[in-house]
Design a protein with these regions (language model features):
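Active-site capping/gating segments
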Residues: 257-292
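Conserved short alpha-helix immediately C-terminal to the canonical SAM/SAH-binding motif I
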Residues: 192-196, 234, 261
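A short acidic, Gly/Pro-enriched loop at the edge of an enzyme's catalytic core
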Residues: 218-226
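Amphipathic alpha-helical repeat scaffolds
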Residues: 200, 228-229
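A short glycine-rich, Lys/Arg-flanked "PGG" loop and its adjoining helix->strand segment in the class I
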Residues: 236-251
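Conserved beta-strand elements of the Class I
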Residues: 129-130, 163
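N-terminal auxiliary segments of SAM/dcSAM-dependent transferases
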Residues: 2-124
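Conserved SAM/SAH cofactor-binding pocket of Class I
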Residues: 135-219
């Protein structure tokens, strides 16, 4: 299937906004491209994990009304003018190559590196995750993923069973395996995410450690650690289910939450967890709690 690639020039100040607007306009995927071959290290909380010169690229179906997309972007950005943009047709195999060319290694905490497969890890002795996002994206560039990865780096789940709820590309579950988890169950509502998780687990030689399921197919005993990087609304709705999935004295890590949503997300968890805000990056927060 052919695609249309809409590319917009961006600065670190507006790249995240453009990414969100492209998603809202119907982009099947959005990537952030380094325009100057600059290595990207995961910065401290509160700073933006973007290159100095960034291109924001949205992938649209070939029959998309691109002028309507551009008009929507301009309306949302006003009074700021629409950035310089380019539109190119792209075959499936070209998109995969473009993604791999533009996704650069990133470091999280003291030990974790996320690298595209086929790329020589900058620190071979570190804990390196080789990642191809496939159709279910999650690469560490978004603050919510970055905060979860740093939490895992600081609290390695050695010999623990872990649930990665909303596994996407499998990045958090694979990181947990690499950091010593005994077993990880990835759960996602999107079958493509399950495929991406299993493919990425194979690339990282942890396929024996992680298995992915649709929610209806998942049955498990309570685990010592549950990770969920999804959205505030589903997190609130899932609080009773998560309380059953986490063992007494076990831990839960939640992200995908805007700062102003933190209190409303914590509220349904307080009946079963001692939960608090543990990190904030830009407008996003990460919550962590212990099961009573």
């Amino acid at each position: 299937m052919p695609w249309l690639q809409l590319e917009l020039e961006a600065s670190p100040d507006n790249a995240e906004q453009l990414s969100e607007l492209l998603h809202a306009a119907g982009a099947g995927a959005v990537t952030l491209q380094d325009a100057a071959d600059q290595p990207l290290f995961e910065p401290p909380p509160g700073t933006t994990p973007l290159w100095n010169t960034t291109r924001v690229i949205g992938l649209f179906a070939a029959d998309t009304d691109i002028p309507a997309v551009l008009a929507c972007l301009q309306q949302q950005l006003a009074p700021v003018p629409l950035p310089i943009w380019h539109l190119n047709p792209l075959e499936d195999r070209d998109w995969v190559r473009a993604w791999m060319d533009n996704f650069q290694p990133m470091r999280f905490g003291e030990r974790l590196w996320i690298c595209p497969s086929g790329f020589t890890p900058p620190e071979p002795q570190a804990i390196n995750i080789l990642l191809d996002p496939g159709l279910a994206f999650g690469t560490g560039t978004h603050p919510t993923t970055a905060m979860c990865l740093r939490w895992l780096d600081a609290h390695p789940p050695r010999d623990l069973a872990v649930i990665d709820y909303g596994c996407g590309s499998g990045i958090l579950g694979i990181a947990a395996c690499k950091l010593g988890a005994h077993h990880v169950s990835g759960i996602d509502t999107d079958p493509q995410a399950l495929l991406a998780t299993h493919d990425n687990a194979d690339k990282n030689q942890v396929s024996d450690c992680i298995k992915a399921y649709l929610p209806a197919d998942f049955r498990a005993e309570p685990v010592p650690l549950l990770l969920a990087n999804i959205l505030a609304g589903p997190l609130q709705s899932l609080a009773p289910r998560f309380a059953k999935l986490v063992a007494p004295a076990g831990h839960i890590v939640l992200s995908g939450i805007l700062a102003e949503q933190a209190d409303s997300v914590m509220q349904p968890y307080q009946a079963a967890f001692d939960i608090q805000l543990v990190a904030q990056q830009e407008e996003w927060v990460c919550l962590a709690g212990q099961r009573r």
